[in-house]
């Protein structure tokens, strides 16, 4: 049986490589305050060639790992999306944190209850231009509201100089989060397939637009001459499992190992009735 996460990480790795190698050429320009690129990939586990998984095609991130330091024992404060991102971006442990944790913090911040800066706010206070593109905090683009595009509801106030989320054919950031090709959006009333292999370019999915936007911003920031902290968040391999067909074709003749534990766990605490996964066709 093929591993879903294995198949769908190759597109994101291709996009990541372009950003990383563009940035590496700029690091020497700001020796005292080097430029910093943080790359977040949603739901990507360490099923990569550089972690010993030899059937995965991940040459670009493998080169990145070989040129730096790869962590083979790494732990996070929380196993869920919003809580883990909260901890990463604030340095705080928030027991019981859910996906709205950063919005909770924003409310406390506005009320004067928090004095510690967030990670990007710290860089901002020390002379960096800070920019967020894609899904860095829980909401792509960092805004709240029905479609995650209300500028009056900011997930991380006083943190980012620029916060961007290209929406393309998907209308709004909420649509981008649950996107399939040709502007299709999970939760819009149409029952969609959880799998999709679309015969198109990288921009057929939001991650292609995110990478394209990030590359343009890096070039613009480099021309400004000031140091920057840029965070770029890719959405795949989060549900739904859609990617350009050219990446899936790399695995056409690949025999992936069977899933180690294919059956439902015995104990209820180990099983979740996913509200996302169960709503696809």
Where are these regions (language model features)?
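Formylglycine-dependent sulfatase
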Residues: 27-281
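Structural motif marking the loop-to-transmembrane transition
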Residues: 12-16, 33
């Amino acid at each position: 049986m093929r591993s879903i996460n294995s198949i769908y990480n190759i597109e994101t790795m291709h996009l990541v490589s372009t950003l990383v190698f563009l940035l590496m050429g700029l690091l020497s320009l700001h020796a005292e305050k080097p430029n910093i690129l943080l790359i977040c990939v949603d739901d990507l586990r360490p099923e990569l060639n550089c972690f010993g998984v030899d059937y995965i095609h991940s040459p670009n991130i493998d080169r990145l790992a070989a040129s730096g330091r790869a962590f083979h024992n790494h732990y996070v404060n929380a196993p869920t999306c919003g809580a883990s991102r909260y901890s990463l971006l604030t340095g705080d442990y928030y027991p019981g944190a859910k996906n709205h944790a950063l919005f909770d913090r924003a409310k406390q911040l506005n009320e004067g209850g928090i004095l510690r800066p967030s990670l990007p706010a710290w860089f901002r206070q020390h002379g960096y231009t800070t920019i967020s593109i894609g899904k860095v905090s829980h909401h792509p683009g960092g805004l709240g509201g029905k479609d995650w595009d209300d500028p009056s509801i900011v997930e991380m106030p006083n943190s980012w100089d620029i916060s961007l989320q290209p929406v393309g054919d998907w209308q709004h950031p909420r649509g981008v989060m649950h996107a399939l090709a040709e502007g299709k959006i999970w939760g819009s009333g149409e029952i969609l397939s959880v799998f999709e292999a679309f015969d198109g370019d990288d921009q057929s999915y939001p991650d292609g637009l995110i990478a394209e936007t990030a590359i343009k911003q890096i070039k613009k920031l480099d021309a400004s001459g000031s140091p920057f902290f840029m965070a770029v968040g890719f959405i795949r391999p989060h549900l739904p499992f859609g990617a350009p067909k050219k990446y899936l074709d790399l695995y056409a003749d690949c025999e992936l190992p069977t899933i180690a534990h294919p059956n439902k766990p015995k104990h209820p605490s180990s099983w979740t009735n996913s509200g996302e996964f169960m709503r696809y066709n």
